[in-house]
Amino acid sequence: MDALELLINRRSASRLAEPAPTGEQLQNILRAGMRAPDHKSMQPWHFFVIEGEGRERFSAVLEQGAIAAGSDDKAIDKARNAPFRAPLIITVVAKCEENHKVPRWEQEMSAGCAVMAMQMAAVAQGFGGIWRSGALTESPVVREAFGCREQDKIVGFLYLGTPQLKASTSINVPDPTPFVTYF
């Protein structure tokens, strides 16, 4: 797939099933994440690969996070079932360090760029994905499960697998004009 076509036609796939990326495919995805823009080569991220029985553990963590937040039964059930939306999930944590030249927000953005790079690498290999976040990224229970320190941030959960719905061949690519000013 042509890189420009991939970027211009990017879209999320919310219904994902087996097979998930494995072996070299998964390594390609992780390597793409490692090449995200990164001021001062700080590599301010950590990737947690969740698959197989790890999804059961992740389910328990999300359920406990929802309970601790005082969520209603419907939200708790949704949290518990979230890891089963896809056969593979990569949780990305921005591991931020104090640096007077690279502020925390920039390190968080680098980790976010890593998520997009990994999603694009998955799509380039024939898989689909969706980047999810939400209130549980801030949950003390979930943060603890991923070893987050006070300065760290869970930037999202990247769900990956084989798309179950065929994407529309006609994509309405927005006109960038209203969003651009030539200065």
From Swiss-Prot:
Residues that, per the record, bind NAD(+): A121, A122, V123, A124, Q125, G126
Cellular compartments per GO CC: cytosol
Cofactor comment text: Binds 1 FMN per subunit.
Keyword match Oxidoreductase: yes
Superkingdom of the organism of origin: Bacteria
Similarity comment text for this entry: Belongs to the nitroreductase family.
This protein's name: Putative NAD(P)H nitroreductase YdjA
Organism of derivation: Escherichia coli (strain K12)
Lineage: Bacteria, Pseudomonadati, Pseudomonadota, Gammaproteobacteria, Enterobacterales
Gene: ydjA
